[in-house]
Curated annotation (Swiss-Prot):
Residues 281-321 form the Rho-GAP domain. It comes from Homo sapiens (Human). It comes from the Eukaryota. Residues 598-653 are annotated as: Interaction with ZNF224. Transmembrane segments: none annotated. It is found in: Nucleus. GO terms for biological process: intracellular signal transduction; negative regulation of DNA-templated transcription. It holds the Pfam family DEP. This is DEP domain-containing protein 1A. InterPro entries: DEP_dom, Rho_GTPase_activation_prot, WH-like_DNA-bd_sf, WH_DNA-bd_sf. GO terms for cellular component: nucleus; transcription repressor complex.
Length: 811
């Protein structure tokens, strides 16, 4: 008898028990049997039950042909103990079942076990009757095991039916309170729960700056949670959305290299490079990245909130942390370890060492002295022209100097065009005169002042200026200053910067979030930008911006629409090695206490992906992770390591913006590096999410919550980690713990005073037979064992045989 497999989940054992007992009661053949000159109807022998149940279990998909006959006998014993069956005389509760001709029958009561649920409370006037009936049932049940009586069984059945009718009546009366949930209600609960968990993990007061709730598709979440393999990979019902078989074969070949190359594959030189190029071409030709264009802002914002893009804290004046309670959560971002370049570290130390009075006086001097501002503007113009003429090897890659060379501040006459990227900081500047322009210019860019040409940054931006960045009256201002990404400058951008014909766009959410976080902490955007763009090898190579400007200025306008989002490796051959070392990701970008936050947040975000995209991402991450860790993998690139090549090749097909000029490939590469290191945790299914949704749906069904957003649900799980021990220590603890428990059992037998002496001797002999070493350790000699039972009982003396008195004759 075949049946569908019971799905994994809570109460699976109870469901299996109910399925087997139901099948056994429904299919076990019953007939008349004769025993001890009596006939019994509707019964079966133990041997017949073993045969039939054995065939049932072997043909059941939940058990399989591995079931043995002895296991079937053990299951029948459990049936007898739990009153699924009883002997022909009505006795049950023991496990006296063997493969013989003993007769059994089915009881009148149902053997099914109810799943744990919250029954409605009975009415007050039925509580007393229920308690009396309950007591009587328990008493009759105990008696029925030994001396069953017909009137007792009849009474217990009547009481059970009475209670059953009362519960059914109560269910009917409370049926109004139990709501019928539609599919829309269930989907809304999924959306609500995952957003609440994401907000709690990130620790933000609102998700408005992170994700739009309309972007959350509950159907994708439910599918990704339910349809997974044993390894957690999504299983697609529609195979047309899956990877082609030749791509899967190629991925398996490289993931298991060289073990999978024992087939009839060719072994010519460069075979593995051709296979890798085939896989890369497939993923790069996909119509959209695996994380989709829609969720680009989500993943960028997650990294911003988690500290992936660090904004150092700099307090100034009266603007302290108490002005913004949320800023206290980001105190850890000011650690010296968060700076990935020497220049940014020195800049931060330079700001911290500056005196507050010097900063105030310098700011007042710059604002009040128009001549000083004009001189600074002219000097910055000269620096701009000078940076265009400097060769690629004379400029530090990704430093703040390159930010100056990206725009001509003197020639701008309209607002520049901000890009949709989290690393940009283009800000509309209020003001029409050159005084305001130079004032903001000093706050936004490095300033070269004095004979020594020191790099100077203002440590106190104006709070009023930062608060009025997005006001409507500032949109029409003709001047703007900002930052450009070093890897995405195009010919069109350069023409717009030179001709002053840039169009204004609304800042994207990730940029506004980064700007808001820097505003709260009175810090700068240029410092984290320089920190992220800075290469480890400052003195080597050149920036992609310089190379892009020199190589693309001579191109015609017909090539503007081409994909110009090139990495540092594609733009410059001289910067190949620094870029590859930059993308290796060997040094963690996140601080240790922020790594767990990023993993949990990305775990929830990856559940939002369409199932085909999530499956492809899982398989891709597994492949590149294995390849990067495989020491036997041949070199796939002449100048790059395997890990650097994986990150550089697949960064565009994982994270990409809809407008390709806005892609920050460095950020995408670092995200791929983080996914490679933690893909097993990020791409697994969180169990706590399913539990929270089930509890929330249960509350909704019982009418405790009218809307999904009105109530509370289960709190987040608390993680506790145990100290890992070696295998040898585990084996030692296993043996010692087991022996200690057995020795404790022996002591309990010895000290049990309620146990009769004869029964105690019997148990001790049985214990000595099973565990002789432990018994000998407790009783090393026979004297110690004899002392346990105390003095031997005195033997009664035999009655004295008295001589019968002889009666004298009366004669």
């Amino acid at each position: 008898m075949e049946s569908q497999g019971v799905p994994p989940g809570p109460y699976r054992a109870t469901k299996l028990w109910n399925e087997v007992t139901t099948s056994f009661r429904a299919g076990m053949p019953l007939r008349k049997h004769r025993q001890h000159f009596k006939k019994y109807g509707n019964c079966f022998t133990a041997g017949e039950a073993v045969d039939w149940l054995y065939d049932l279990l072997r043909n059941n998909s939940n058990f399989g042909p591995e079931v043995t006959r002895q296991q079937t006998i053990q299951l029948l014993r459990k049936f007898l103990k739990n009153h699924v069956i009883e002997d022909i005389k009505g006795r049950w509760g023991s496990e006296n079942v063997d493969d013989n001709n003993q007769l059994f029958r089915f009881p009148a009561t149902s053997p099914l076990k109810t799943l744990p649920r919250r029954y409605p409370e009975l009415r007050k006037n039925n509580i007393e009757n229920f308690s009396k009936d309950k007591d009587s049932i328990f008493k009759l049940r105990n008696l029925s095991r030994r001396t069953p009586k017909r009137h007792g069984l009849h009474l217990s059945q009547e009481n059970g039916e009475k209670i059953k009718h009362e519960i059914i009546n109560e269910d009917q009366e409370n049926a109004i309170d139990n709501r019928e949930l539609s599919q829309e209600d269930v989907e809304e609960v999924w959306r609500y729960v995952i957003l609440i968990y994401l907000q709690t993990i990130l620790g933000v007061p609102s998700l408005e700056e992170v994700i739009n709730p309309k972007q959350v598709i509950p159907q994708y979440i439910m599918y990704n949670m339910a349809n997974t393999s044993k390894r957690g990979v999504v299983i697609l019902q529609n195979k047309s959305d899956d990877l082609p078989h030749w791509v899967l074969s190629a991925m398996k070949c490289l993931a298991n290299w060289p073990r999978s190359n024992d087939m009839n594959n060719p072994t010519y030189v460069g075979f593995e490079r051709d296979v890798f190029r085939t896989i890369a071409d497939y993923f790069l030709d996909l119509p959209e990245p695996l994380l989709t264009f829609e969720y680009y802002e989500l993943f960028v914002n997650i990294l911003v909130v988690c500290g992936y893009i660090t904004v150092s804290d700099r307090s100034s004046g009266i603007h302290k942390i108490q002005d913004d309670p949320q800023s206290s959560k980001f105190l850890h971002l000011n650690n010296l370890n968060s700076f990935k370049s020497t220049e940014c570290l020195l800049l931060s130390l330079l700001h911290r060492e500056k005196n507050k009075e010097e900063s105030d006086s310098t700011e007042r001097l710059q604002i009040s002295n128009p001549g000083f501002q004009e001189r600074c503007a002219k000097k910055m113009q000269l620096v701009n022209l000078r940076n265009r003429r400097v060769s690629a090897n004379d400029i530090m890659g990704g430093s703040c100097h390159n930010l100056i060379g990206l725009s001509n501040m003197h020639d701008l006459s309209s607002n520049s065009k901000p890009r949709c990227c989290s690393l940009e900081g283009i800000v509309d500047v209020p003001g029409n005169s050159s005084k305001e322009a130079s004032s903001v210019f000093h706050q936004s860019f490095p300033n070269i002042e004095g004979q020594n040409n020191k790099l100077f940054l203002e440590s106190k931006p104006k709070q009023e200026f930062l608060l009025n960045l997005h006001s409507e009256e500032n949109i029409q201002k003709p001047f703007s200053a900002g930052f450009k990404r070093t890897s995405t400058l195009t010919v069109q951008d350069q023409e717009e910067l030179c001709n002053g014909k840039c169009k204004s766009k609304q800042l994207c959410r990730s940029q506004s979030l980064l700007l808001r976080s820097s505003t709260r902490r009175n810090s700068y955007i240029n410092t984290p930008v320089a920190e992220i763009i800075m290469k480890p090898n400052v003195g080597q190579g050149s920036t992609s911006v310089q190379t892009a400007m020199e190589s693309e200025l001579g191109e015609s306008s017909a090539t503007i629409n081409k994909r110009l989002c090139k990495s540092t490796i594609e733009l410059s051959e001289n910067s190949l090695l620094p870029a590859s070392s930059m993308l290796t990701g060997t040094q963690s970008l996140l601080q240790p206490h922020l790594e767990r936050v990023a993993i949990d947040a990305l775990q929830l975000c990856c559940l939002l992906l369409p199932p085909p995209n999530r499956r492809k991402l899982q398989l891709l991450m597994r492949m590149i992770s294995r390849m990067s860790q495989n020491v036997d993998m041949p070199k796939l690139h002449d100048a790059m390591g395997t890990r650097s090549l994986m990150i550089h090749t697949f960064s565009r097909c994982v994270l990409c913006c809809a407008e390709e000029v806005d892609l920050d490939e460095l950020l995408a590469g670092r995200l791929v590096s983080f996914l490679m290191d933690h893909h097993q945790e990020i791409l697994q299914v969180p169990s706590y999410l399913q539990t929270a949704v089930e509890k929330h749906l249960d509350y909704l069904k019982k009418g405790h919550i009218e809307n999904p957003g009105d109530g509370l649900f289960a709190p987040l799980p608390t993680y506790s980690y145990c100290k890992q021990i070696s295998a040898q220590e585990f084996d030692e603890q296993k043996v010692s713990t087991s022996q200690a428990a057995i020795a404790e059992l022996l002591e309990n037998i010895i000290k049990n005073r309620s146990l009769p002496l004869k029964e105690k001797r019997k148990k001790l002999k049985q214990f000595q037979k099973e565990y002789p070493l432990i018994y000998q350790k407790r009783f090393p000699t026979t004297e110690s064992e004899a002392a346990l039972f105390g003095d031997k009982p005195t033997i009664k003396q035999p009655m004295l045989i008295l001589r019968k008195p002889k009666f004298r004759s009366l004669r």
